[in-house]
Amino acid sequence: MTDKLTSLRKLTTVVADTGDIAAMKLYQPQDATTNPSLILNAAQIPEYRKLIDEAIAWAREQSDSREQQIVDASDKLAVNIGLEILKLIPGRISTEVDARLSYDSERSVAKAKRLIKLYNEAGISNDRILIKLASTWQGIRAAEQLEKEGINCNLTLLFSFAQARACAEAGVYLISPFVGRILDWYKANSDQKEFAPHEDPGVISVTEIYQYYKQHGYDTVVMGASFRNSGEILELAGCDRLTIAPALLKELSEAQGEVERKLGYAGEIKARPEPLNEAQFYWEHHQDAMATEKLADGIRKFAIDQGKLEKMISDLL
C-alpha cells in the first residue's frame, strides 16, 4: 500500500512551505515557498550562518550607509536561502517582497526587480523564481506589471473572492489562498470550534476559487496554503498545487492509503465578467470581515518578522 503523500502527488503538485534545507532533502517537493517568517526561522539554523555572513559581507561592499546595508543584506539573505533550496528542487522558489511595501505598487516592482537581479547574477533564470506579493490592490497592480515584463508572481495573503478574481483578471501566474488562517478566524469569531474538512471555511474558499478559475478558463495557478491539519489538505486533493509545511508532509508520508480526488473541472468554459475596478474591488473585499482582518493581520505579522530579521542583521553588522 502507498502512503498518502505519494498518492497525493499523483493528483496535485506538492510544494514545501519552509526554508529548511533538511526538510527539502527529506520530502523532495517540486517547488518551495518562503516568506519573511520562514526566512527568520531559517536564519536561526546553524548551517545557515555562512549564508548570513556572506550576505552581510556582500552588503558592506554595496554601500557605506548602515541603513542600506541592512536592507541589502536582508534581500541577499532571502536570495541566498533561495539558492540553497533551488539546488534541491526541480521547480521554483517563491521569494517575498517586503510586506511593508504592500500598499506601494512602484516600490514593490522595484524590490521585485532587485530580488530577480540577485538571482540572475547567481545564474538563476526567471523561470525558476516566483515573486511573492501580498494580494492588496497595489500588490496585484505590481504583479500585473511584473508579469508583462516576464517576471512571474505568487500572490499571497489571499482571503477573499474579490482578491482571487482581481488576481486572475490581472494575469497573475499563481495565487496562494490561505486555508488555515481562514479557519482560525472562524474558530475565534463564531460559536463553532470544530469543523469537518468538507465544511472547513478555508477549504470551501479555495474550492470556490478553483471552480471559478476553471469555469472561466483562467490560467492562474491555484496553490492552497496555510494548512492547520492534513484533513484540509486531503479535502483539496486535485488542486493545482498545495504548499505544505514539513510537519504535515511528515504526517502524510506516514499515513497509508490512496487519496481521492476532490477538485477537478471538466465542464464548458463560461464567458468572463468585466474586470473589477478599484472601487468594486475594495467594496467586495470589505464585505468580508474575515478577509479584511486577516489581510491586515498577515501584512502586520510579516512586517514584524521582517523587522526582527533586520534587527538580527543589524546586530551582526
UniProtKB/Swiss-Prot annotation:
The active site is at K132. One of its GO terms (molecular function) is transaldolase activity. It is found in: Cytoplasm. SUPFAM superfamilies: Aldolase (SSF51569). The keyword Transferase applies. Pathway: Carbohydrate degradation; pentose phosphate pathway; D-glyceraldehyde 3-phosphate and beta-D-fructose 6-phosphate from D-ribose 5-phosphate and D-xylulose 5-phosphate (non-oxidative stage): step 2/3. It is an enzyme of class 2 (transferase). Its EC number is 2.2.1.2. One of its GO terms (cellular component) is cytosol. This is Transaldolase. It comes from Photorhabdus laumondii subsp. laumondii (strain DSM 15139 / CIP 105565 / TT01).
